[in-house]
Design a protein with these regions (language model features):
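Zinc-dependent deaminase
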Residues: 23-60, 108, 121-188
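A short, polar/charged loop-to-alpha-helix boundary motif
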Residues: 85-95
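Immediate flanking context of iron-sulfur cluster ligation sites
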Residues: 107-119
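Charged/polar low-complexity intrinsically disordered segments
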Residues: 2-5, 13, 23
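Short beta-strand scaffold segments in enzyme catalytic cores
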Residues: 65-73
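Short beta->alpha transition motifs characteristic of CBS
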Residues: 76-83
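A cytosolic small-molecule/anion-sensing beta-strand core signal
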Residues: 71-72, 99, 111
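Short hydrophobic alpha-helical segments enriched in small aliphatic residues
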Residues: 7-9, 21, 28
């Protein structure tokens, strides 16, 4: 099983690397190299797969967001944004992946599962993560306007939140951000 506990050695400016498990553990996707340069490490396979799902969403005219659910080191579900295709405003990548994983496991609780997603989840998706009991959330790009993990509603920080996954941010951030920027640039 992939774990970032010993990998994340760099902190984002002004933010601690590791805080309370309910808070975000920030990773930049790079580690200090020689002569002060930053050396990138390869993307973890689940995030690379989530980025592939995001590219598929973009090719289908959807906002390029992809998600992957892993249990015991194996991918059990993938999802990508599909609100337009499904005529369903709830068809976000995370929700699509959670639905597939729950059906695959024949259980609404996804205990021990990891969710890898290319963008910080919105309030709806963060709520679904809570209800599904996802153990760990890894996301690439922050979403200051619509995110609800480290921005906005901060769902996992609310006293009413009954389950708080471990959260890791910034893994594949550059790739996910560029994919989103390119998609919206082409739309303008």
């Amino acid at each position: 099983m992939f774990s970032l506990e010993n990998v994340c050695a760099v902190k984002r400016e002004g933010a601690p690397l590791a805080i309370h498990p309910a808070k975000v553990k920030l990773c930049t996707g790079a580690v200090p190299g020689s002569a002060g340069r930053m050396t990138r490490w390869p993307l973890p396979a689940p995030m690379a797969l989530a980025l592939d799902q995001a590219r598929l969403a973009a090719a289908e005219g959807e906002v390029p967001i992809g998600a992957v659910i892993v249990k015991d080191g194996a991918v059990i579900a993938t999802g990508r944004n599909a609100p337009r295709a499904h005529h369903d405003p709830t068809a976000h990548a995370e929700i699509e992946a959670i639905r597939t994983a729950a059906a695959s496991l024949r259980n609404e609780r996804l205990d021990g599962c990891e969710l890898w997603v290319t963008l910080e989840p919105c309030a709806m998706c963060a709520g679904a993560i809570v209800h599904a009991r996802i153990a760990r959330l890894y996301y690439a790009a922050a979403d200051p306007k619509g995110g609800a993990v480290e921005h906005g509603a901060r769902v996992f920080d609310q006293p009413q939140c009954l389950h708080r996954p471990q959260v890791y941010a910034g893994i594949g951030e550059a790739e996910a951000s560029e994919l989103l920027r390119g998609f919206f640039r082409a739309r303008r």
